[in-house]
């Protein structure tokens, strides 16, 4: 077996590397070239919104394409640029805006992986006769430990927990996992940068890309209001107890769990508890009203060894991660008449619809990724949940 788990020599193995123009994917290309693989680099032109083309830390725009080209020249490998701007807008940017005006907190990086990188780009790699598509994600994959799943691969958290990107890859299907390779899974970020320096790559000291590449300066409201002008319609700011505390200029300016910049002063610390998109109300309350014990999932991608219905029916003990910055915490996947849900043993504050809930076998670097889903709705502690439901059923002021 070669280093990518193929039963042939590296020179007889063609690999397409998804090159963003950053240090991680550049090092992947360099490592594979060094090992003797037949390497092709592909960069996707995903968007162009003026200043971001040359903004430090942007991704998949003009400067990044040029950086990827220069890296490929240094390594002596072919480089191709594919224009996926229309596809990216259709499957990532527009749904992002729709999700925001629906009161959700979307994760466009997951959608990009699902619909562009691991779908369209993967198909292109196959058309080019590649045996695998390699990326610079910090995650690991290896052959499945179960004999009956021979030929399949499983996902695991990486060695560098601080760079763990498994949360954004929970939706990767089994077919995609079997074709993908992640050469950085056993490396730390400092080791990756050291390799880039050693290889003489121009991107060795380049800043890391931001999570949401198409949002200038991180202002979600700017792009949402541009795509959906009605999203800026105002409404009420309402306390969980029913008091109208003030008004706002659009729910797109708020997120669940937000405390600063709410726009009302009552002498008590208040947090955004819920965004009522239908009535354009921002519902606020005390911190304890954010505590969530149960989340219902949609679009579940299950990577476990048994059927999901069987696992959920009996209760599947696991660890769940509802934020990219959190460590996996004890949980149990179950189901009822309303669908698949996850019980968070220790609870979690500020869980919002649209976020991902990734599932794991544990918390360490050997933890297997069981997949996960998008949070459809969450349930709070009984008192807060009852107050919220009563408020949602009451008509908003005209």
Swiss-Prot record:
Its main location: cytoplasm. One of its GO terms (cellular component) is cytoplasm. It comes from the Bacteria. It is found in: Cytoplasm. GO terms for biological process: tRNA wobble position uridine thiolation. InterPro entries: MnmA-like, MnmA-like_C, MnmA-like_central, MnmA-like_central_sf, Rossmann-like_a/b/a_fold. This is tRNA-specific 2-thiouridylase MnmA. It comes from Sinorhizobium fredii (strain NBRC 101917 / NGR234).
């Amino acid at each position: 077996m070669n280093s990518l788990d193929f039963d042939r020599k590296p020179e007889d193995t063609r690999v397409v590397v998804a090159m963003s123009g950053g240090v991680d994917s550049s090092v992947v290309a360099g490592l594979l070239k060094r090992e003797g693989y037949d390497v092709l680099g592909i960069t996707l032109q995903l968007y162009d919104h003026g200043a971001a083309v040359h903004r430090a830390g942007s991704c998949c725009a003009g400067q990044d394409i040029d950086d990827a080209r220069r890296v490929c020249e240094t390594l002596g490998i072919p480089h191709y640029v594919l224009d996926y701007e229309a596809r990216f807008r259709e499957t990532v940017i527009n749904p992002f805006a729709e999700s925001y005006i629906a009161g959700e907190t979307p994760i466009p990086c997951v959608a990009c992986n699902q619909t562009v990188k691991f779908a369209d780009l993967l198909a292109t790699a196959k058309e080019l006769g590649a045996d695998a598509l390699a990326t610079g994600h910090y995650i690991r994959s290896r052959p499945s430990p179960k004999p009956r799943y021979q030929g399949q691969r499983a996902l695991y958290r990486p060695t560098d927990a601080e760079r763990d990107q498994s949360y954004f890859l929970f939706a990767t299907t089994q077919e995609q996992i079997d074709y993908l390779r992640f050469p950085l899974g056993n490396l730390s970020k400092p080791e990756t940068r050291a390799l880039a320096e050693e290889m003489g790559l121009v991107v060795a000291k380049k800043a890391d890309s931001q999570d949401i590449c198409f949002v200038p300066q991180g202002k979600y409201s700017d792009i949402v209001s541009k795509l959906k002008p009605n999203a800026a319609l105002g409404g009420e700011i309402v306390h969980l107890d029913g008091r109208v505390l003030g008004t706002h200029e659009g729910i797109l300016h708020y997120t669940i769990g937000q405390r600063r910049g709410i726009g009302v002063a009552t002498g008590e610390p208040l947090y955004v508890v819920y965004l009522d998109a239908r009535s354009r109300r921002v519902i606020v309350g005390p911190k304890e009203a954010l505590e969530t014990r149960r989340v219902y999932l949609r679009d579940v991608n299950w990577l476990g060894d048994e059927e999901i219905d069987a696992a959920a029916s009996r209760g599947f003990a696991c660890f769940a991660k509802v934020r990219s910055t959190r460590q996996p915490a004890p949980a149990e996947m179950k189901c009822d008449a309303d669908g698949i849900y996850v019980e968070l043993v220790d609870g979690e504050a500020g869980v919002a619809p649209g976020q991902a809930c990734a599932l794991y076998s544990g918390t360490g670097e050997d933890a297997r990724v069981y997949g996960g889903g998008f949070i459809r709705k969450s349930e709070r502690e009984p008192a807060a949940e009852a107050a919220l439901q009563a408020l949602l059923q009451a008509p908003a002021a005209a």
